[in-house]
Amino acid sequence: MKLWGGRFTKETNQLVHNFNASISFDQKFYVQDIRGSIAHVTMLAKQGILNDEEKNKIIDGLNGIRDDIESGSLVIDSTYEDIHSFVEAHLISRIEEIGKKLHTGRSRNDQVALDMKLYTRDEITVLDELLRDLLFELYSLMKEHTETYMPGFTHLQKAQPITLSHHMSAYFEMFRRDRDRLSDIFKRMNTCPLGAGALAGTTYPLDRAYTASLLSFTEPTRNSMDSVSDRDYLIELLSALSTIMMHLSRFSEEIIIWNTNEYRFVEIDDAYSTGSSIMPQKKNPDIAELVRGKTGRVYGALMSLLTTMKGLPLAYNKDMQEDKELTFDAIDTVKGCLSLFTGMIRTMKFNRDTMKASAVLGFTNATDAADYLVNHGVAFRDAHGIIGHLVLTCIEKNCSIEDLSLTELQAISPVFKEDIYDAISLKTCVEKRNTIGGPGVDAMNEVIKECAKYLENNPSIS
């Protein structure tokens, strides 16, 4: 069944039909399509456009179609142009003439705009739950590792001592912002396009506010042309998904590096690793690598939709059909990555001794040694030069700063006293950094309390 054709004298070329059809992918939102149709006919009856008997028969028919699709007794037929024509055709076959009234006061343009918003809204809720699960794992690691010392890095070189708790807190903040972005998008997109028609509304006395309420939207959209041609919310969503993937990719890169024999900071669980077909010793971080690799796929969806929309005049154009596969794939990709990544870090083992030893051997306490001199009256620029010379001496001797005797230290600067060793211990270096946002135990405990409160007060998107 076609939803059009009265003015045509020839059948559609089969290649044209195949090229034009979207049912192979828009069947994904059959639930949302039926939900929107039920709200539409409920409103039509309220407005006296349909009677209650017609409304009830249509709703029963639509519910039956949904139930049959879900049970597998009705298979979505790819010979139809789209999911809208499939549902309407099967409705008419079940309830006959009354089914032809379903589309009264509606265009496929506002119908598909509604379906995409309903689908996207549902998926944002799922994405939010997955992000919250990841945040819980990060929160658990933060609580457990407030005194797990490790080097912090700049330029991928050891810089200053921090804790694993502090490092995980950085990712907690990133993924918290990702949740905030999804929440912002949800609020901005939560307007109902149903009733906008093809582009100029309809002559029927529709109650758009009523259908918006039935479908849990905050209000109807305010302009009918914008309603059917707006894809901003999808671009925003793809941008937010790209940012989530960027954060996952950065984290994956660190896990891949930390998992190497050269670092040995972490060991990925067997359940989240794979082997080699030729090298029996290999245990590869494939999940982290695939998450990193799939980031470009999501970026590509964003750029594709931006490019599709950039030259389109108002209002609807068939180009917009390209939004669906891009969005569906990006959402599914991010959901899969979030789920797997959360499981991977939940089961990952951290090698505390190796991390601590790496911080000691990397001169991460050099800044604190310079601060020691400053606190004893040496100008910072001079202290910087003295400690640089001290580090060079340690490199030549293949030792850490702490390994030098007091005599050796005083040969470089007489300002050094016995208390230097306590001043540059990893514990002291970290504990002195107790300002807001720092790695010190007290500072981190405050952060952990705040994170617990955040997770408790933000159970789901709203």
UniProtKB/Swiss-Prot annotation:
Major site of localization recorded for this protein: cytoplasm
Q: Which gene encodes it?
A: argH
Q: Which Pfam families match?
A: ASL_C2, Lyase_1
PROSITE patterns, per the entry: FUMARATE_LYASES
Q: In which pathway does it act?
A: Amino-acid biosynthesis; L-arginine biosynthesis; L-arginine from L-ornithine and carbamoyl phosphate: step 3/3
* Organism the protein comes from: Lachnoclostridium phytofermentans (strain ATCC 700394 / DSM 18823 / ISDg) (Clostridium phytofermentans)
Q: In its keyword annotation, does this UniProt entry include Transcription regulation?
A: no
Q: Does the keyword Hydrolase apply?
A: no
For this entry, list what GO says about its biological process: arginine biosynthetic process via ornithine; L-arginine biosynthetic process
| Entry's localization field | Cytoplasm
Q: Which reaction does it catalyse?
A: 2-(N(omega)-L-arginino)succinate = fumarate + L-arginine
Q: What is this protein called?
A: Argininosuccinate lyase
Q: What class of enzyme is it?
A: lyase
The family classification in the record reads:
Belongs to the lyase 1 family. Argininosuccinate lyase subfamily.
* EC number per UniProt: 4.3.2.1
Q: Which InterPro entries does this UniProt record tie to the protein?
A: Arg_succ_lyase_C, Argininosuccinate_lyase, Fumarase/histidase_N, Fumarate_lyase_CS, Fumarate_lyase_fam, Fumarate_lyase_N, L-Aspartase-like
What GO cellular-component annotations does this UniProt entry give?
cytosol
Q: Which GO terms describe its molecular function?
A: argininosuccinate lyase activity
What are the UniProt keywords, alphabetically?
Amino-acid biosynthesis, Arginine biosynthesis, Cytoplasm, Lyase
Q: Which CDD domains match?
A: Argininosuccinate_lyase
